[in-house]
């Protein structure tokens, strides 16, 4: 699997350490093992997990600005865990309301020795951080309108929202609230993944 990961990383132009590569392989092995009992993802094949979960998360990394991030509706830690593995200098809170997902993330943290990940079991609208985050991450979580509404209290004053989407969500963007601005849209290329991937960045419009 390590050889396969190396090939995908090369295609994506992503350079990481050997230790980080080993940790990513361990993550896939743990996800594959837990998935048999706890049904954490519909992707069953470890090889497909490398593309659809690991690489699909890693391509977001160049667009992470700041030090403190929250991954809302993280599921089994995606994209939070892969991003935390290759960004050990950044802090990640992984939020989900399902206990089995948070238990899996805790196991990954323990096995991989991650010190920059904090799992939190909570509904996003009920979670109240002491300090706002530099960025709120979302992948396959909800519609843009719901995500921005439920997470409005999470970023700092200068913080942003990053939403990972498939096709460009023209219809969803037309329904954005007036106090939210789309500041960037990045087309992402994920090796061997069919279909479009877009990363949309939003910010609150500060009242003058």
Swiss-Prot record:
One of its GO terms (molecular function) is rRNA (guanine-N7-)-methyltransferase activity. CDD domains: AdoMet_MTases. Keywords: Cytoplasm, Methyltransferase, rRNA processing, S-adenosyl-L-methionine, Transferase. It is an enzyme of class 2 (transferase). Its EC number is 2.1.1.170. Pfam families: GidB (PF02527). It is found in: Cytoplasm. It catalyses: guanosine(527) in 16S rRNA + S-adenosyl-L-methionine = N(7)-methylguanosine(527) in 16S rRNA + S-adenosyl-L-homocysteine. S-adenosyl-L-methionine binds at residues 73, 78, 124-125, 139. GO terms for cellular component: cytosol. InterPro entries: rRNA_ssu_MeTfrase_G (IPR003682), SAM-dependent_MTases_sf (IPR029063). Specifically methylates the N7 position of guanine in position 527 of 16S rRNA. Belongs to the methyltransferase superfamily. RNA methyltransferase RsmG family. This is Ribosomal RNA small subunit methyltransferase G. It comes from Aeromonas salmonicida (strain A449).
């Amino acid at each position: 699997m390590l050889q396969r990961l190396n090939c995908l990383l090369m295609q994506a132009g992503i350079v990481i350490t050997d230790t980080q590569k080993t940790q990513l392989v361990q993550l896939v092995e743990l996800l594959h093992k837990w998935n048999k009992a706890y049904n954490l993802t519909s992707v069953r094949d470890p090889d497909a997990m490398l593309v659809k979960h690991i690489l699909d998360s890693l391509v977001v990394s160049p667009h992470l600005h700041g030090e403190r991030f929250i991954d809302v509706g993280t599921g089994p830690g995606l994209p939070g865990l892969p991003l935390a593995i290759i960004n050990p200098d950044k802090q990640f809170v992984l939020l989900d309301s399902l206990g089995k997902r948070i238990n899996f993330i805790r196991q990954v943290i323990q096995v991989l020795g991650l010190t920059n990940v904090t799992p939190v079991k909570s509904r996003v609208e009920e979670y109240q951080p002491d300090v706002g985050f530099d960025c709120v991450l979302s992948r396959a979580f909800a519609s843009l309108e719901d995500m921005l509404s439920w997470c409005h209290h999470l970023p700092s004053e200068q913080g942003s929202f990053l939403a990972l989407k498939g096709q460009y969500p023209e219809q969803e963007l037309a329904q954005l609230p007036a106090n939210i601005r789309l500041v960037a849209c990045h087309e992402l290329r994920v090796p061997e993944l069919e279909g479009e991937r877009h990363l949309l960045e939003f910010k609150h419009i500060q009242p003058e």
